[in-house]
């Protein structure tokens, strides 16, 4: 069985499959992805594969520099996005935006 390259919480699976979620914001541990990478995507909860994505762009961001566009690409409001990031990465202040398209 082939390993997944990146995982997402199951609650984001439907938005990714529908093309409503087109970025992910990660910490330094996942800052190595680069445009052109093709990644197998699994669910965080059970590592079950659900699609393949291609990385189209990467950039860095802080909570203070998040924009409404980032929120739109995550399919949530800016307030929701900041809250989710603080819940997942409570001790971090610098993040890595990975833009992608589903293949």
UniProtKB/Swiss-Prot annotation:
Name this protein carries in UniProt: N(4)-acetylcytidine amidohydrolase
Keywords: Hydrolase
Annotated InterPro entries: AC4CH, ASCH_domain, PUA-like_sf
Gene Ontology cellular component terms for the protein in this record: cytosol
CDD domains per record: ASCH_yqfb_like
Catalytic activity: N(4)-acetylcytidine + H2O = cytidine + acetate + H(+); N(4)-acetyl-2'-deoxycytidine + H2O = 2'-deoxycytidine + acetate + H(+); N(4)-acetylcytosine + H2O = cytosine + acetate + H(+)
Entry's family note: Belongs to the N(4)-acetylcytidine amidohydrolase family.
Active site: residue positions: 21 (proton acceptor), 24 (nucleophile), 74 (proton donor)
Domain ASCH: 6-100
A molecular function (GO) term: hydrolase activity, acting on carbon-nitrogen (but not peptide) bonds, in linear amidines
NCBIfam families to which the protein is assigned, alphabetical: PRK04980.1
SUPFAM superfamilies, sorted: PUA domain-like
Broadest EC class assigned to this enzyme: hydrolase
Source species of the chain: Klebsiella pneumoniae (strain 342)
EC number: 3.5.1.135
């Amino acid at each position: 069985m082939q390993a997944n390259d990146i995982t997402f919480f199951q609650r984001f699976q439907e938005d990714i499959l529908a093309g409503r979620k087109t970025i992910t914001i990660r910490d330094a541990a996942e800052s190595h992805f680069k445009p052109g990478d093709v990644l197998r995507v699994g669910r965080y909860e059970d590592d079950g594969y659900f699609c393949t994505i291609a990385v189209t762009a990467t950039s860095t961001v802080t909570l203070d520099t998040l924009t409404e566009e980032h929120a739109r690409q995550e399919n949530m409001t800016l307030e929701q996005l900041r809250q989710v990031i603080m819940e997942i990465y409570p001790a971090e202040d610098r993040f890595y935006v990975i833009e992608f398209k589903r293949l």
